[in-house]
């Protein structure tokens, strides 16, 4: 825009001055000379007359031998074809001079623009501008040289640094929070595991104590039932076998199915034998003691750990020396 303005001004000045001056000069140089009708006696060229004057001599298109007086320029009167030729020459010269001056003014304008903006190529002008700004203002950065304000560039840089710091703080906080959560989860898991183990241990101990208590209570109830209820031989055998097996499990002894069946048959047979002996001697104790010993020996054959318990059970069921006899359904 600056180049166009300056070029217009230069062109106007140079064109106006040159055109005005040259035109004025041409007008003065090629001004139409005065045409005088030449009159002479009897001579004419169709546009005027050619006459003879005794004082000025013969007036014609071509000055002849009649020389004007000394100190006086001959008058040049042109007309007809010669006048048109003069006009053509004058106009051609003026056009040629105007074209030359116009071309010169254009060259001057282009040269002036090149000097001001540094060439016609945009790339060259841009490079020249950058080099000039870098040399003239070395303290500015490229953004500021391109037109960005220093305050705006500083604010932008500060905002970017602030965003980086905030992002770093967020990442650090997330990492710390994740670490704290992991530590809390580990502590909670450890507490739950320890509590579970302790609860399991206490529960197992309590269950064992309760089982033993229930077994003792069950044995007492069975003993009471056997002592106060008349049972058949089969029922008595079943109760004795149940208590015997429970006791064997408590002591860690395990019997096979065949051993259990054999033991049950022997107990059943011994109870039948006790029933027969009781009928023979209702209040006798020797038969009861012998039967108890036989059952004890029989249980010992199946499991040695049940011998003492079986003896105690028989001693509790069949009161030795009691006058009421055996509390079974063998009474008649």
From Swiss-Prot:
- What name has this protein been given in UniProt? Minor spike protein
Give the note: Phi KhT, a host-range mutant of phi K, can grow on E.coli C and B, besides K12, and is more thermosensitive than the parental phage phi K.
Q: Which domain of life is it from?
A: Viruses
Pfam families with a match to the protein in the record: Microvir_H (PF04687)
Q: How does it assemble?
A: The virion is composed of 60 copies each of the F, G, and J proteins, and 12 copies of the H protein. There are 12 spikes which are each composed of 5 G and one H proteins.
Which function does this protein serve? Minor spike component of the viral shell. Involved in the ejection of the phage DNA in the host and is injected with the DNA in the periplasmic space of the host. Involved in the determination of the phage host-range.
- Keyword annotations for this protein? Capsid protein, Viral genome ejection through host cell envelope, Viral penetration into host cytoplasm, Virion, Virus entry into host cell
Q: Nucleotide-binding: present as a keyword of the record?
A: no
Q: Which organism is it from?
A: Enterobacteria phage phiK
Q: Name the GO terms of the biological process aspect.
A: symbiont entry into host cell
Give Gene Ontology CC terms. viral capsid
Q: Where in the cell is it found?
A: Virion
